[in-house]
């Protein structure tokens, strides 16, 4: 199930393993063309396609739209981008602008901590600059394999599943480094103890995120 393999579905109840597929529908990586530079600022594509049959896939990303659920009405808002240090820094510092003046007199007298509770925000599988992080961490460019994110077979079933494994690996690493790890760093800056509940079904490796906090 490609939606499970690219982490676009949450709380998935079963696997659908399609063992048979038409080999004529396999996409060869060398046949994939990156048309990004042919798209203008209005999102219009200008491209003179070579002869033959082509499928154009337009890919982008946006907020997941998920809101925090364990909060009073005045504290409900969009969840931050869990793969971005800048996102958690913005949320954390905005909160501390209001909270820290109240707890500052007690920080060095008693133990005060902040906690990330269990994962209840659905799935996330992309962030701004993900393609660059992927290349840096894996050593290869993902562009020619991106159709696999839409359920296409690229190269072969084995190659496709290996690529999607790499996708999940980088997602987990970004979550551990840029969210949980950065949370601990921010807590340390304020003299606070960091805690987390490192579990539930999300784009993470539970022991990895627990070790970051």
Where are these regions (language model features)?
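Short, well-ordered coil/turn segments that N-cap beta-strands
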Residues: 108-112, 188-194, 213
């Amino acid at each position: 199930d490609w939606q499970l393999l690219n982490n676009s579905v949450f709380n998935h109840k079963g696997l659908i393993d399609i063992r048979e597929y038409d080999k004529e529908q396999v996409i060869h990586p060398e046949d994939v063309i990156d048309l990004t530079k042919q798209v203008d600022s209005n999102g219009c594509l200008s491209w003179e396609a070579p002869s033959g049959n082509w499928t154009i896939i337009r890919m982008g990303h946006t907020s997941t739209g998920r809101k925090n659920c364990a909060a009073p009405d005045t504290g409900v808002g969009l969840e931050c981008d869990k793969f971005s240090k800048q996102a958690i820094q913005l949320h954390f510092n905005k909160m501390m602008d209001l909270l820290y003046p109240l707890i500052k007199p007690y920080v060095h007298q008693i133990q005060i901590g902040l906690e990330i509770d269990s994962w209840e925000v659905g799935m996330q599988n992309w962030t701004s600059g993900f393609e660059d992080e992927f290349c840096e961490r894996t050593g290869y460019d993902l562009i020619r394999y991106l159709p696999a994110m839409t359920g296409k077979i690229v190269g072969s079933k084995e190659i496709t599943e290996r690529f999607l494994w790499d996708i999940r690996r980088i997602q987990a690493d970004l979550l551990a480094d840029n969210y949980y790890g950065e949370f601990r760093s921010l807590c340390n800056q304020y003299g606070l103890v960091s805690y987390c509940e490192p579990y539930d079904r999300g784009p993470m490796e539970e022991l990895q995120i627990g070790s970051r906090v």
